[in-house]
Design a protein with these regions (language model features):
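Non-catalytic signal-transmission and effector/linker regions of two-component phosphorelay proteins
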Residues: 1-2
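Active-site residues of response regulator receiver
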Residues: 7, 54
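Two-component/phosphorelay signaling modules centered on CheY-like receiver
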Residues: 10-31
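Acidic catalytic/metal-coordinating carboxylates
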Residues: 35-38, 61-64
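Conserved catalytic motifs of ABC-family nucleotide-binding domains
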Residues: 47
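Receiver (REC) domain active-site loop signature in two-component systems and cognate sites
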Residues: 57
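A short, hydrophobic beta-strand element within the central beta-sheet of small alpha/beta folds
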Residues: 75-80
Length: 80
């Protein structure tokens, strides 16, 4: 399973990644993006099953990104 973490704060992304044993939860790959536009590109390319996303980010909000992904990745689980 793949997880995508989308947040404009690098410290938040690295903190979430390093503080949880993702492999123990069945997450084999943790991807990250710094805003909604990059998150959209990475999600289209890698097709993560879970997307952990900040709501307020520059360039594209998390909500706008997930609205665009709704038809592309209908089975992905978004978490805000």
């Amino acid at each position: 399973m793949k997880l995508l973490i989308v947040d404009d704060e690098e410290l938040t992304r690295t903190g979430v990644i390093s503080s949880i044993d993702w492999k123990a939860l069945g997450i084999e790959e943790v991807l990250q993006a710094d805003d909604g536009i990059n998150g959209l590109e990475i999600a289209r390319k890698y097709r993560p099953e879970i997307i952990l996303c900040d709501v307020r980010m520059p360039r594209m909000t998390g909500i706008a990104m997930l609205e665009k992904l709704e038809n592309i990745l209908p089975d992905s689980i978004p978490i805000f």
